[in-house]
Amino acid sequence: MPKADIHPTWYPDAKVTCNGEVIMTVGSTKPEINVEIWSGNHPFYTGTQKIIDTEGRVDRFMRKYGMKEKTTGDKQDKKKK
């Protein structure tokens, strides 16, 4: 026999709300649950996700430290003159 008065109150129809709108009902120990993001307004699930085009790490390193591909040798010709 379980002990009396040690278990939390169970709410079988607890309301889950997002921005004041009731999204669903679940069983919980709280009568109301407020969430900021759920699958109905998350960009990944709604298809409004922005894909950021980032350059590769190697390209970024090469650009940052000036290690570009060798050219035809224009700089060497100027130094010899």
From Swiss-Prot:
GO terms for biological process: translation. Pfam families: Ribosomal_L31. Keywords: Ribonucleoprotein, Ribosomal protein, RNA-binding, rRNA-binding. Coiled coil: none annotated. InterPro entries: Ribosomal_bL28/bL31-like_sf, Ribosomal_bL31, Ribosomal_bL31_A, Ribosomal_bL31_sf. One of its GO terms (molecular function) is rRNA binding. One of its GO terms (cellular component) is ribonucleoprotein complex. Binds the 23S rRNA. Belongs to the bacterial ribosomal protein bL31 family. Type A subfamily. PANTHER family: 50S RIBOSOMAL PROTEIN L31, CHLOROPLASTIC (PTHR33280), LARGE RIBOSOMAL SUBUNIT PROTEIN BL31C (PTHR33280:SF1). Part of the 50S ribosomal subunit. This is Large ribosomal subunit protein bL31. The lineage of its organism: Bacteria, Bacillati, Cyanobacteriota, Cyanophyceae, Synechococcales.
